[in-house]
From Swiss-Prot:
A Gene Ontology term for the protein's cellular component: plasma membrane
Species for this entry: Salmonella arizonae (strain ATCC BAA-731 / CDC346-86 / RSK2980)
Enzyme class: hydrolase
Recorded name of the encoding gene: cdh
Residue runs in coiled coils: none
BP term (GO), one: CDP-diacylglycerol catabolic process
Name of the protein this chain belongs to: CDP-diacylglycerol pyrophosphatase
NCBIfam families linked: cdh, PRK05471.1-5, PRK05471.1-6
Lineage: Bacteria, Pseudomonadati, Pseudomonadota, Gammaproteobacteria, Enterobacterales
Length: 249
């Protein structure tokens, strides 16, 4: 009887998660790609004007775009077709280190805000295949939630240079955490670190959401959460961000 009950519960959870996914994808999943490929890139190449993007770097392979959600949130996106974390292109050595480029683009937040924003308030995230609304790779550059900031500060000395479970997880979901230096982040993509260092991750990259946060000692913490429908975790790493930026108040 108990086994039947657990099975029915699992079915209900999976159906509910699928329903959320359907609702989330009911809009135009190619909207960001169309903005990049049909507006920003042509405008930059033909008129040296990045609009509606804030910046377009054709040779470097990326754009920076002001997201409509939140006063300071920006997105960094490739200038060519990469759907998301599941793309094999992200594991190619020739592919730009999009997370590092996104970190360099954090200054757009300060310019928009009118004051310098401390690195400790900034976070970068990318959602899993199920946890995203758009089928064009986009890294969210935005503020970190104050409670997540506090937890990561408290866990500073417990975060290893290897991928290990973060004690207590974040936002009710399990996360892996790994500490890296600024030099490591600049030289090696977090996508590649996850694929090469976490068992079986390479074959299931689309199930993962990733985040990058600066720590008080100058290091960075990489965070990865894997899709788990039984716990209603769609691996939307964006959950650690606060697009209203209460941390600045």
């Amino acid at each position: 009887m108990k086994k039947t009950g657990y099975f029915l519960l699992a079915v209900i959870v999976i159906v509910a998660a699928a329903g959320v996914g359907y609702w989330k994808f009911s809009g135009n999943p190619d909207a960001l790609r169309e903005i990049v490929l049909e507006q920003c890139l042509p405008d930059q190449l033909q008129h040296q004007n990045p609009a509606p993007c804030a910046e377009v770097k054709p040779r470097a392979g990326y754009v920076v775009f002001k997201d409509r959600h939140g006063p300071l949130q920006y997105l960094l996106m490739p200038t060519y077709r990469i759907n998301g974390t599941e793309s094999p292109l992200l594991l190619e050595p020739a592919t730009p280190n999009f997370f590092w480029l996104a970190w360099q683009a954090r200054d757009y937040m300060s310019k928009k805000y009118g004051h310098d924003i401390p690195d400790s308030a900034v976070s970068l995230t990318v959602n899993s295949r199920l946890g995203r609304s758009q089928d064009h790779l986009h890294i969210h550059i935005s503020c970190i939630r104050p409670d997540v900031r506090e937890q990561l500060d408290n866990d500073l000395t417990r975060i290893s240079t290897r991928w290990l479970p973060l004690p207590g997880g974040l936002m009710g979901h399990e996360y892996l955490a790994r500490r890296v230096t600024e030099s490591e982040l600049a030289q090696r993509s977090p996508f590649m670190m996850l694929a090469e260092e976490v068992p079986e991750a390479r074959d299931h990259m689309g199930r993962y959401g990733l985040a990058v946060v600066r720590q008080s000692d100058g290091s960075f913490v990489l965070l990865a959460t894997q899709r788990n429908l039984l716990t209603l975790n769609r691996a939307s790493a964006e959950e650690i961000q606060d697009h209203q930026c209460d941390i600045l108040k």
